[in-house]
């Protein structure tokens, strides 16, 4: 473990999970664009006459095809326009809270009149947005980097009006701190942390269960959840916990990707990852009638493992973080919930990695529900297999000598192996933009 005391590590991990586990309305990439524009507008007198957006390729890929909340339209240009019209930066990840038909009509008019431009930019942090707002008198440049609401700099008429202190220092500390831990360390912290500190975990469980219920009722996104439920009711799918996790996780993603206004608790800064971590663990907990406290700890463990994996793969990457990183978090939480020790927890993770490594990210959109549903059911199955001593052997394929080695291999694959693949995927998925 780190040179810090166990108590300090526990508090730092808790702080990190709280920071990366917050409610959001809508996909967080369009949210980041709208939030950046809305923040810049605060520094401007009068109306916004022109918005020039520059975004990282990952923001572009993950934001172009997902429906904006309370609308039936997609696009980062629309997101930017709405941020300038009705976005409130004080709302953070709820920046789309005030969107209505009148504001949407105004945003569409801005797009029609070419008020908003959108271009990708190279060699930036995966989470990067630069919004240049021009009015009658003022020009404001707002820069977001490293997090979906992390404003780094505001420049007003050529002068710096705001600059964040110690740029990236906290992120680097968090990254170093997480990489010093083992899965065993995280498991021990999960078991020892005071349950009184985990109230926010229960909030996320209830929030995402409600989102899944709404997703089953409303015709949003791909409507995969309700379609799977229909198949189950017709006797074509079972009623086991893996299938229920598949249905509910798909339904939550349908709602989120389809522009639903229901808030969703994120994990690692992503709503889909929040759904994929929380719902499968909750389904298994309800199936085995686990105590509330054990459910809370299992979900906390899932969030922590998801964040641990993402410190190697990156916040946004060429692989599907929702299916892989969040799925790994879910299976770890389930294995622990079922009474698994380190061998079984690690085994469940290895089973998931042997199964789903290579699932690429081709952008946020309605069909993300398919990937999430696959990951949710496989997370349940992988944990039960590990509990029955069915575990992929070490040093086979991507599987290394330990679970930590394997996660490091995944990170190498993402950053070194899939870097070019991400560019190719961007050219395929975003050819009409770039």
UniProtKB/Swiss-Prot annotation:
GO terms for molecular function: L-cysteine desulfhydrase activity. One of its GO terms (biological process) is L-cysteine catabolic process to pyruvate. InterPro entries: Ser_deHydtase-like_asu (IPR005130), UPF0597 (IPR021144). HAMAP family: UPF0597 (MF_01845). Belongs to the UPF0597 family. This is UPF0597 protein CLI_2075.
